[in-house]
């Protein structure tokens, strides 16, 4: 095992890890922070105290549990609204929403997950609780499959061998050979789809956005409800639409 770099500030590393451990949790106790991060209670207490005093965590005086503050959320929005990709994408997402009347998302990769960073939804929409910032495994969403379709064969094989295929719904694809076939199909068609694989009743299609240098940056994702949309109809109508949207955003980066 390599020695940590002399440039690494281990206390800062612990603090950032503790902040990341709030993903998926409304609040955490010191014991939970320690367990989530493999650190002692004393270390968790020092980190939590520092984050509280700097305004990134709030400590409930009654329960003694900690939760993230708006200041912490603001870091994410600073990233979001300073990136040219996101500045250019919103108008395109809005146009696509007007054309199809459905939810349109922008997602970017983070390891083996996709993070939803922007959304335009119709006024009638009553959403599942899937706020901007939510991470979804690449294998369970069209956005991730569209991006994985661009991976070199060896890297795709490695990821598929190592991926954890949880059964989120009765329709989630967990068979590696079937996943590979769906990704191959996405490579051929230039868009991917996922049919009720993370949420029951949700069908989504996605196409990749590219930067100036040709590198993939993320994906446009259109999410529609079943049974109002069948897979055949979504592929026929939304496949070409999501490809056009991704190309429009790519040209402006």
Task: Please name every model-derived segment.
Residues 1-87, 94, 247, 251-252:
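N-terminal helix-turn-helix
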């Amino acid at each position: 095992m390599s020695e940590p770099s002399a440039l690494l500030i281990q206390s800062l590393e612990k603090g950032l890890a503790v902040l990341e451990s709030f993903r998926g949790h409304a609040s955490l106790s010191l014991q939970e922070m320690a367990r989530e991060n493999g650190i002692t209670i004393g270390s968790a207490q020092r980190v939590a105290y520092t984050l509280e005093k700097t305004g990134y965590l709030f400590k409930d005086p009654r329960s003694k549990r900690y939760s993230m503050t708006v200041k912490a959320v603001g870091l994410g929005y600073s990233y979001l609204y300073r990136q040219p990709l996101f500045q250019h994408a919103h108008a395109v997402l809005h146009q696509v929403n007007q054309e199809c009347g459905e939810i349109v998302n922008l997602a970017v990769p983070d390891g083996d997950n996709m993070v939803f960073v922007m959304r335009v939804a119709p006024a009638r929409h009553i959403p599942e609780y899937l706020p901007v910032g939510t991470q979804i495994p690449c294998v369970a969403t069209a956005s991730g499959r569209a991006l994985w379709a661009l991976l070199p064969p060896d890297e795709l094989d490695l990821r598929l061998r190592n991926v954890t295929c949880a059964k989120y719904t009765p329709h989630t694809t967990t068979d590696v050979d079937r996943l590979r076939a769906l990704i191959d199909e996405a490579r051929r068609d230039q868009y991917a789809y996922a049919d009720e694989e993370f949420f029951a009743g949700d069908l989504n299609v996605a196409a990749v956005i590219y930067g100036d240098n040709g590198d993939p940056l993320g994906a446009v994702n259109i999410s529609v409800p079943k049974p109002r949309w069948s897979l055949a109809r979504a592929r026929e109508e939304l496949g070409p639409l999501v490809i056009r949207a991704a190309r429009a955003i790519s040209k402006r980066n």
